A protein has these predicted regions:
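Short amphipathic alpha-helices and their capping/turn residues within compact interaction modules
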Residues: 20, 24, 94, 98-101, ...
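Contiguous terminal or domain-adjacent regions
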Residues: 154-313
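Surface-exposed, flexible loop/turn segments at secondary-structure boundaries
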Residues: 75, 152, 180, 320
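Structured beta-strand/turn binding interfaces of compact recognition modules in eukaryotic regulators
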Residues: 70-73, 114, 147-150, 175-177
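Alpha-helical bundle/repeat cores within regulatory domains of eukaryotic proteins
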Residues: 107-159
Length: 320
């Protein structure tokens, strides 16, 4: 609830800035093309997934937040142009958003700096990530861990630190042991950083003919989009009344919550028409009904299988 006039003005300004960026960056075009379409257009993009630079480990116990692992040593800055990395960063950010479980809207990020050298240092990609986190996916980051940073990173950090928004800076922790990743359970931490999880799904190749998102002018997509917009207008109308009431009208509170659920469900229904398949669908982590399920193989031979999550509700983990 944005209370002051200044906050409202900043909110409107930032939202307009975000919409402008999404249009100029063709975010929806990127997610519609997916790994297959982007790789077809740009051979350098095709090497990003197989390099296993970034992937999701699973969910945290508290608040069910996706845990994103980034192996910096797997990124060789000179092997792809800046434009390719911009597309890859946007595609990864949008893909990880599909793993978010309502009502949580945040993710945890672990930068594994072990093996880092200057050939891995990519100012463009680093600044793109920071710019996106601060400006275009606000309040998305719950915590960011910089794991086993070598001494040569100290100079880089001194240059980067002043550029960070204070809210982002306060969410960054440096650590050297897996048990210092305090909001990431040990059974989710990868064995390469001292955790218990082995055989993590890091990359699954797209298959020829794999589904891509529909073109903006496709009649089916336009029909689904119109249906979504109709519900969004209903949500906007009740939200206007809710704002006037300052959130004090119980009937409007309930009506707005109901419209919010309708809107979220409609977008989940619409999403397959907007997005190409991601590696998490190819791996079966996101199934055809958009249920979410990670399987955690442990180094002691156990397999932990969570009850499926949905975009609307989360459940607890159980062991086999």
């Amino acid at each position: 609830h944005v209370r002051s006039r200044r906050q409202r003005q900043m909110c409107i300004r930032d939202r307009c800035k975000c919409v402008k960026w999404r249009i100029e960056s063709d975010v929806m075009g990127i997610v519609a093309k997916g790994d297959l379409g982007l790789s077809r257009e740009d051979p350098a993009y095709a090497s990003q997934g197989p390099a296993e630079k970034v992937y999701a480990l699973g969910y945290s116990d508290k608040n069910v937040m996706p845990v994103i692992m980034i192996h910096v040593k797997n990124h060789i800055a000179a092997t792809q142009p800046a434009e390719t990395m911009t597309k890859f960063v946007i595609s990864a950010a949008e893909t990880f958003r599909t793993l978010v479980v309502y009502p949580n809207d945040k993710v945890i990020v672990v930068f594994d700096m072990s093996g880092f050298g200057m050939r891995n240092m990519d100012w463009h990609s680093l600044m793109t990530v920071l710019k996106i986190l601060e400006g275009y996916y606000p309040e998305t980051l719950a915590k960011l861990y910089i794991y086993r940073a070598p001494w040569i990173f100290q100079g880089i950090w001194k240059a980067v630190n002043p550029l960070l928004d204070p809210e982002i800076r306060n969410k960054i922790n440096f650590c050297n042991k897996s048990d210092e990743l305090d909001v990431v359970p040990q059974y989710i931490c990868e064995d390469t950083i001292g955790g218990d999880q082995v055989d993590v799904v890091k990359w699954v190749e797209p298959q020829p003919g794999e589904k891509e998102g529909l073109d903006r002018n496709d009649p089916k997509r336009q029909e689904m989009w119109k249906s979504y917009r109709d519900i969004s207008r209903d949500y906007e109308e009740v939200t206007k009344k809710w704002i006037i009431s300052d959130g004090q009208d119980d009937r409007l509170n309930a009506e707005r919550d109901q419209q919010s659920k309708r809107l979220r469900l409609k977008y989940i229904e619409l999403e397959p028409f907007l997005r190409a398949r991601s590696m998490y669908q190819r791996a079966g982590i996101i199934n055809e009904d958009l249920l979410l399920q990670f399987t955690y193989k442990q180094k002691d031979g156990r397999v932990l299988r969570p009850v499926s999550y949905t975009h609307l509700r989360a459940h607890e983990t159980e062991a086999d």
